[in-house]
Every structure is written in C-alpha cells, then in structure tokens.
C-alpha cells in the first residue's frame, strides 16, 4: 500500500476510536459517575 493510504487509515482509526470512547463515556456505564450541574443547582435559574 502507499504511504498516503496507510496514513489515512491510521488517522481514520484514531478518529473512530476517539469517537467510540467519547460515546461510551457519555452514554455507557461510566456516565453514571458524571455529575449533572443542572441537578446540583435545582430551580435557582427561575
């Protein structure tokens, strides 16, 4: 394969891995440990 193809595949793989990890953190098991700033402040915005 050409160098440009390998670099493109590598960068695409990194991007897909980062996106998958971000989605897992946002919606998967670790998301239960995230704090919700709106719940902490309640109805102070009214």
From Swiss-Prot:
It is a single-pass membrane protein. PANTHER family: PROTEIN PSBN. InterPro entries: PSII_PsbN. Keywords: Membrane, Plastid, Transmembrane, Transmembrane helix. The chain crosses the membrane at residues 5-27. It is found in: Plastid membrane. This is Protein PsbN. One of its GO terms (biological process) is photosynthesis. Belongs to the PsbN family. Its main location: plastid. Disulfide bonds: none annotated. It comes from Cuscuta obtusiflora. May play a role in photosystem I and II biogenesis. GO terms for cellular component: plastid membrane; thylakoid membrane.
């Amino acid at each position: 394969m050409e160098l440009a193809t390998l670099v493109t595949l590598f960068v695409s793989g990194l991007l897909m891995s980062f996106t998958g990890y971000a989605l897992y953190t946002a919606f998967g098991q670790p998301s239960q440990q995230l704090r919700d700033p709106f719940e902490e402040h309640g109805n102070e915005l009214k």
